[in-house]
A protein has these predicted regions:
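Short Gly/Thr/Asp-enriched flexible loops that form oxyanion-binding sites at enzyme active sites
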Residues: 51-54, 82, 101-115, 159-160
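Buried hydrophobic positions in well-ordered alpha/beta secondary-structure cores of metabolic enzymes
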Residues: 18, 39, 74, 99, ...
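ATP/NTP phosphate-donor binding region
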Residues: 1-92, 344, 378
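Structural motif
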Residues: 14, 36-38, 64, 91-94, ...
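C-terminal charged capping/lid subdomain of soluble metabolic enzymes
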Residues: 313, 317-388
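Active-site segments that bind and position negatively charged phosphate/pyrophosphate groups
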Residues: 214-330
Length: 388
């Protein structure tokens, strides 16, 4: 029997895939009738030949570039980006980059809509869900939208929320609004060509984490199972192929589509669980990049949950190409094959940090979604020991 639920169709219009990004962007800007396009990116993209290609394709519609985005999209850089958009009189933001760039552009939208001009002003909007992500709000016409062109596999472009860090307090906070999902996503595998291979592989494992935790969920539905299973097949085969042959654009295209599908289960109401919750805490407390948190945590989380969802985990193992139904081993084998870190100690995490990490993770809302109930920080420390 299929459990009751709801599938939400978000305020995203198009996902363009497999076409040259510069030409596709020019066509989308024409369709959207935008005249002042600000590119939001980081210094590495801004200093590459990519930016010149986009500027040429946009012609007089190119209003400039904000290249000040840094890791974890600090509040200050978001405020500076919003000021650049105001100065350019921008009517469209084009985010070219990975998760930090796309998150920064989303929070810039919020700053522009509510005239936030100081980092402290963001506090009034953090951590709050603002509206149903499938419902167009009354003020929709007052939002400047985003076209996202990803260069990694973080899949930030497929959500209606973004994060910005506050270095003074040592936290990264979520900001949420239905209009923060990009209006258009353009997936061009060539846009990943300059991405360092370790970053491509670890963000690919983050996408594996998205799909695996959704496929492991006890409240899963047929839509979620279909998209999450295929996401794992595309991602596992694509990661192996890209690792063997970095110039294989077909593999990179499969990876982009797999990252897209890894997020689709969320649209049918299926959330991720404890792996993501501990990953959030690990990133905040120990500054471990999210892709590396997935590599070091996910196999242990699956093993800890195995008694609660063994049948679901067999689906994961099969989608990863394993002959046996042990998802933890199948994931560990994939991570080892890719030459990525497999243990928390490999990424500089000390056992001394476990109590603080466990405390943060226990308070994360995603912990409630875990197939096996998490009753104490001791449960989480047990997983951390398994992963260390």
């Amino acid at each position: 029997m299929i459990a009751p639920g709801m599938h939400r169709f978000l305020l995203m219009e198009r996902v363009v895939h497999g076409r040259p990004a510069a030409a596709a962007l020019a066509e989308e800007v024409d369709r959207l009738e935008r005249r002042r396009v600000l590119v939001v990116t980081n210094r590495s993209v801004a200093n590459s030949a990519l930016l010149a290609g986009f500027a040429a394709s946009l012609g007089e519609r190119y209003a400039g570039c904000f290249s000040g985005v840094t890791a974890h999209s600090p509040r200050r850089c978001v405020i500076e980006g919003a000021e650049a958009a105001r100065a350019a009189n921008a009517d469209l933001l084009v985010a070219i980059g990975g998760g930090s760039v796309i998150d920064a552009a989303k929070v810039m939208q919020l700053c522009l809509r509510h005239d936030i001009r100081d980092p402290a002003g963001l506090s009034d909007y953090s951590g709050r869900g603002r509206g149903d992500p499938s419902t167009r709000p009354a003020d929709a016409d007052r939002w400047i939208r985003i076209v996202a062109i990803p260069t990694t596999l973080s899949a930030a472009e497929f959500t209606w929320f973004g994060g910005a860090s506050d270095p003074e307090r040592g936290v990264k906070e979520p900001f949420t609004h239905p209009m923060m999902i990009p209006q258009v996503v353009i997936m061009d595998p060539a846009m990943t060509a300059e991405t360092p291979m370790p970053l491509l592989l670890t963000t690919g494992m983050k996408a594996v984490d998205h799909a695996a935790e959704r496929l492991a969920a006890l409240n899963a539905n047929p839509y979620n199972d279909a998209v999450s299973s295929l996401a794992l097949r595309l991602l596992s085969s694509g990661l192996r192929a890209a690792h063997r042959a970095p110039a294989d654009m077909g593999a990179r295209g499969d990876l982009q589509y797999g990252a897209f599908m890894s997020m689709c289960g969320s649209w049918s109401g299926i959330a991720v669980g404890l792996g993501h919750a501990i990953g959030h805490a690990l990133g905040a407390h120990c500054a471990v990049p999210h892709g590396e948190t997935s590599c070091t945590l996910l196999p242990s989380v699956m093993r800890w949950n195995a008694d609660a969802n063994g049948a679901r985990q067999a689906l994961i193992a099969g989608a990863l190409g394993a002959r046996e139904g042990d998802a933890g081993t199948a994931l560990a084998d994939l991570i080892n094959e890719l030459g990525l870190p497999t243990r928390l100690r490999d990424v500089g995490v000390s056992r001394d940090a476990f109590p603080a990490i466990a405390h943060k993770a226990l308070g994360d809302v995603l912990t409630r979604n875990n197939p096996r109930p998490v009753r104490s920080t001791g449960d989480i420390e047990e997983i951390l020991e398994m992963a260390w």
